[in-house]
């Protein structure tokens, strides 16, 4: 059954918006030389001292989004530039101390490999997977991937969700059983340890060495990662996964949304990226399983950003999309706006089904 599209479903409007926001990264955050992007706008002394490895992995991801939307080779060139920048700034290595950082890079690099047919890039994604699998998985807290090298007993959704997604995608790409085995084993651990019976996903366990779950950290990011993991395993043949993803999506909206939007989970920084991760993987759920109510939430919430969050000629996004940006804005926050708008551009091209 197909319904009439909502006013915010015009694909040309969303394509134009996505293009404007892609270009906003250079407009507001562009930096010379190896810095590539300033961490904040406006940028002040000391703001660029942190090398935000995982933010840049998401920059790579959104450039691929732009390429898939437009087919323009310039977007692939931008993606390659970001990848090369990460490698150079990381002393030529694919690895760092944070397993989640490495997994985000692997996911983006694998998408770049798929977009370009570059087998060498696909091999880099496999190298990261093997490194994380070898050094990240252990028996603390019953299994799972550690968050970082220095805390092998601390396990969380930010490390295990991307590992499931990457493992499932590598299995789809290669057919190798080891990837699907790792995906299902990690998903079983995640569901047993951090997914509540209502579908809401907790952040982590044993951060302080006390075996406690960090229930006070309630992030859209974790919900999005679990949704993405479910969608990937559904594509691998597990028919039960889409219903679980739907349950989590609706639990996240019920618990974390206000006035139809996620209103902010901190003052920029890493938290600025969280809702973008939710939008990316919730959009994949809509494309995989229909979900008309979730589709409407994604489109309407991002429309709110464009109607209320941007003023005059400013395209800087706030963490709360109901209001214009004020003060300093991190490019992580801008990335969430770009991801959501790219998701809407993709969804607007598809019919609304029920």
Region annotations inferred by a language model:
Residues 70, 112, 116-119, 170, ...:
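Structural motif corresponding to the intra-repeat A-B loop/turn of tetratricopeptide repeats
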Residues 219-257:
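Oxyanion-binding "anion nests"
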Residues 167-171, 179-230:
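Active-site cradle of extracellular carbohydrate-active enzymes
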Residues 76-170, 181-184:
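Extended ligand-binding groove/face enriched in aromatic
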Residues 8-9, 49, 117, 175, ...:
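Second-shell loop/turn segments in exported
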Residues 2-60, 66-104, 112-113, 131, ...:
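CBM-like carbohydrate-recognition segments
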């Amino acid at each position: 059954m197909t319904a009439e599209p909502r006013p915010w479903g015009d694909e040309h409007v969303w394509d134009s918006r996505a293009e404007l926001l892609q270009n906003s990264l250079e407009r507001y955050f562009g930096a010379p030389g190896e810095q590539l992007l300033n961490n904040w706008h406006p940028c002040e002394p000391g703001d660029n001292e942190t090398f935000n490895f995982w933010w840049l992995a998401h920059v790579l991801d959104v450039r691929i989004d732009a390429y898939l939307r437009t087919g323009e080779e310039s977007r692939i060139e931008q993606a390659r530039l970001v990848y090369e920048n990460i490698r150079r700034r990381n002393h030529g290595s694919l690895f760092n101390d944070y397993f989640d950082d490495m997994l985000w890079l692997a996911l983006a690099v694998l998408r770049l490999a798929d977009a370009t047919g570059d087998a060498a890039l696909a091999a880099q994604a496999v190298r990261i997977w093997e490194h994380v699998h070898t050094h990240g998985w252990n028996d603390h807290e019953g299994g799972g991937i550690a968050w970082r090298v220095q805390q092998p007993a601390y396990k969380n959704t930010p490390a295990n969700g991307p590992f499931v997604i990457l493992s499932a995608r590598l299995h789809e790409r290669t057919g190798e059983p080891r990837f699907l085995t790792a995906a299902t084993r990690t998903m079983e651990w995640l569901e047993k340890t951090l997914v509540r019976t209502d579908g809401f996903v907790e952040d982590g366990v044993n951060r302080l060495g006390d075996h406690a779950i960090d229930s006070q950290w309630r992030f859209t990011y974790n919900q999005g990662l679990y949704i993405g993991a479910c969608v990937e395993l559904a594509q691998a043949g597990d028919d039960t996964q889409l219903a679980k993803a739907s349950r989590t999506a609706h639990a996240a909206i019920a618990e974390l949304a206000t006035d139809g939007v996620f209103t902010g989970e901190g003052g920029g920084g890493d938290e600025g990226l969280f809702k973008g991760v939710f939008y990316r993987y919730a959009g994949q759920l809509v494309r995989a399983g229909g979900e008309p109510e979730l589709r409407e939430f994604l489109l309407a919430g991002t429309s709110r950003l464009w109607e209320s969050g941007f003023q005059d000629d400013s395209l800087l996004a706030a963490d709360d999309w109901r209001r214009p940006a004020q003060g300093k804005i991190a490019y992580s926050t801008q990335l969430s706006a770009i991801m959501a708008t790219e998701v809407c551009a993709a969804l607007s091209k598809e019919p609304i089904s029920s």
